[in-house]
Amino acid sequence: MILSKKNNAVIILILLILSEVILAGTTGKISGKVTDAATGEPLPSVNIVVVGTTMGTSTDVNGNYVLLNIPAGKYTLKFSMIGYADFIVEDVRVNIDLTTKVNAYLKEEVIQGEDVVVVAERPIVRKDVSNSQMNLAGESISSLPVQNVVEVLKLQAGIESGRDGIIVRGGSANQTVFMVDGLSQNDERSNIPYATVSLSAIKEVQIQTGGFNAEYGNLRSGLINVITKEGNSSVYSGTINFHYSPPAAKHFGNSVYDPYSYFNRPYLDPDVMWTGTNNGAWDSYTQRQYPQFEGWNAVSEATLKDDDPTNDLTPSAAKRIYEWQHRRQGEITKPDFIIDVGFGGPVPFVSEYLGNLRFYTSYYQQRDMFVFPLSRDSYSETQFRTKLNADISKSLKLVVSGLYGEINSVSPYNWNVPTGSVLKTTYDVANLLNSSSGNAILYMPGYFSPSSIYRTMFAVKLTHILSPKAFYDIKLEHFTNRYSTYQMELRDTTKKYQPVPGYFTDEAPYGYWGYSVSGIDGMIMGGWMNLGRDQSVNSTTSLKFDIINQLNLSNQLKAGAEFVYNDYNINAGTYSPSMNTWTREQVYQLFPYRLSAYVQDKLEFEGFIMNLGLRAEYSDPNTEWFQLSDFDKLYSAGYGNSLEKSAAKEKVKGKLYLSPRLGVSHPITDNSKLYFNYGHFLSEPASSYRFRIQRESNGLVTYIGNPYLKLERTVAYELGYSQNLYDQFLLNIAAYYKDVLDQPGWVYYQNLNSTVQYYKATNNNYADIRGFEITLSKVWGKWVRGFINYTYDVRTSGYFGLTKYFEDPVEQRDYLRLNPYQSKPHPQPYARANLQLFTPDNFGPAISGMYPLANITLNILADWKAGAYTTFNPHNIPGVVDNVQWVDWYNIDLRFSKDFDFEDFNLQLYVDVTNVLNTKFLSQAGFSDIYDYNDYLESLNFSWEEGVEHGNDKIGDYRPDGVPYDPLEPNPNNDPEIAKRNEERKKNKSYIDMPNIKSMTFLNPRKITLGIKLDF
């Protein structure tokens, strides 16, 4: 709910008195009861120590105890009391924000020094969890055939991988918060998570897909909380992990640079290159598969007939110049690799004098080669992260964290203003080719601008333990993101190259040249290139305070507040010295802030656990904004550049929101529970929706933000059931519903004479998401572990009101004939399965003290997703929507590893294989244009078609290699011979008109990665 300004100050003051900051959970707690093993009587004043730490407590008069603020991880507890043998519990697992129950049963001491040692039982069903969440230990992640955190996340139910990051239960990437040690790693320019963490540094990952407690804000779909390792105060330890993938093509088929590829064959095939594609030996089908070319004879004749005697060329010379201008070869010759290193321990020389000062540092470097090179040949990323811990006293703990990250890639924007995204995946790059500039993209390195992102973070956290039952944290964080999308090095225009005798030229198409230049075949070699520029810097500073008080054994109160201050210094645009039409800018510097506070109460009883919270969020754009009519002339060319000076302004008022949160867990038995959660979740719109001002070089305003936007809202419900099966398996079933409101969208405005044409942001988008998930997992076992999950959801989205407003009533009436857009709900269920097969320690025969068959792991991952629906309506029949479906997608990956245990270190050798079956799935990157795409669809035989064209094809079906194109014959008279031939054609799919860019039609063939990992 949104509150009026009258109540704002009062409510904020009340919440701040009750609490001080939102602190993302990084710790858990241990509780239990200590009794006499013989009589069952509770034992008071029993000392409890977390071995190897300074943490401890004692039991109360009823034998109960609580240990708060325990960092996530595995521990050993020691219970001691005079007259009783020490009771030691090993392998106690503490998870983020959860309660671990450990009861102790002390025996009277018979033999002095005799200890009772037990291993903690891990509950299959966590009774105090009232939402869908998964806690993954670092050692569990390390055995999976994955190379980064995102690949781990997308294995979970309800999570998919999207263009900008993970999609949680249908919510876009900017609806998820990614935290490391309680520090947000979301880039607040777009709210997209920066989800890079060295796997060697991970201690635990908690994944929540709904039901977030009131302490968490600026999120609506998912919460990822990564806890990194802490250095030991007495010994050094570390991990070195190296992945290596030999150079190999990232597509099936011949190289896109091959002489017979889509872009080259018309100019290099002897059958047509001299006389032209329409006059040579090609049949009509082959002609449709390639660009038209008049032939080198015609090119030569044109040079001889013009008035320039310096460009006269023979046909052979013209062909040679083509080869010179297309000399770039982009086959992959470098390997993909990942270097992942972690190391920690006491800080040398000063550790014991500075509160056992210790450190853990990680280094991560990755390179993924592009499927073909652009202004850079790969996506590369580097990250350095360090954490210092110090025990200033028994009650004061200090943590200092720092991060430096760097991404080097290519901007995906052609004539659009860059907004921070870069190219990464094989499909992202391959999909660039299906445009009229495809050959320029392949052969001119500067078509897309090189782009880098530099990230730095510094944070300090102080924990003060007030008593065994209360503590608070103070945290200060500063996170900066610097963007650099820039102009390449200028072209050397010296005509010093002689591709044919007497014909001199420069180094084109290499180097930057801002003026129009065309190749001998018409290929762009200047002007339309390297347009994107971005020198933006945005920084986020947050101050947090959080307090936790265990009021009694059943009631834990948590409260906090947070102040977040953003500095958006946006300076992006496109630039061309020769084309003002494509010179535009997006420049602003603003300082919005938000303040939030919450109260969270956790009630824990034997058959009922409840998390009850209330969160207040105040968002202030902290700016003045323009007061203009919808069709004001200040939006038009010649006026827009003076908008800031000429337009009337007013101060934008902040808004206050209240968000209730409720989570209930009801353990039915020791082995089963029901849970339910409900909450209102809010997030700020991306900065481009709130503050963007984009103008053409002539002043025409084309986009303008709206700082009056409401926060985006999701009201979510979840009902779930968990069951322990045979003390081996956990079954979890969850159903959810998300009502999504106030998402921003762009609305178009145009005046009578079209001098005003711009887009303005408004809260006009909604969505309705509902679904269910089933997960069956086996998380422990010496021989077999694994999981299988299934997700089914239905998503509907649309717009309130109109998306276009015309001052001309005729144009407005024409537009109103269209219905407001609403997507049709077509579910795309998906499933994942993981099977881990182990051989235990000391398994098999020993050879010289070694066990060759021990510690071998085979880890198999399988994915499946139902095909998406789309529309194929070549005859524009009214009402035909989403009438065709893509084929289902599936994939299998595996890792095979062998561990060697030595006295001081562990060595693991492994091999990862992705796309084990080398399965082909048709990619839209293979279509040269919309006509090529339609030709392919026309050739398929869908279930709703009649006659000879009736069939059961889906988009993605393809003609196998080696099968020539042979279309179906019309058979109006049901001729049995024609029917027989058509049956054979349908059997081998010869009738399918395949995409023209064959090299990009099938991507991501089988890939083998070799790895070595050293733990010491």
Task: Name each model feature, range by range.
Residues 23-119, 124:
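Periplasm-facing N-terminal accessory domains of Gram-negative outer-membrane beta-barrel systems
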Residues 85, 90-101, 114-230, 324-327, ...:
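Periplasmic N-terminal accessory/gating domains of Gram-negative outer-membrane beta-barrel systems
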Residues 249, 253, 786, 851-875, ...:
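C-terminal beta-signal and adjacent terminal beta-strands/loops
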Residues 267, 289-323, 411-448, 488-531, ...:
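Solvent-exposed loop segments that connect transmembrane elements
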Residues 293, 322-418, 423, 449-472, ...:
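Transmembrane beta-barrel wall of Gram-negative outer-membrane proteins
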Residues 473-477, 667, 673-675, 679, ...:
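Membrane-embedded beta-barrel scaffold of Gram-negative outer-membrane proteins
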Residues 527-530, 534, 542, 554-671, ...:
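Signature of Gram-negative outer-membrane beta-barrel scaffolds
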Residues 736-739, 756-869:
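Gram-negative outer-membrane beta-barrel transporters
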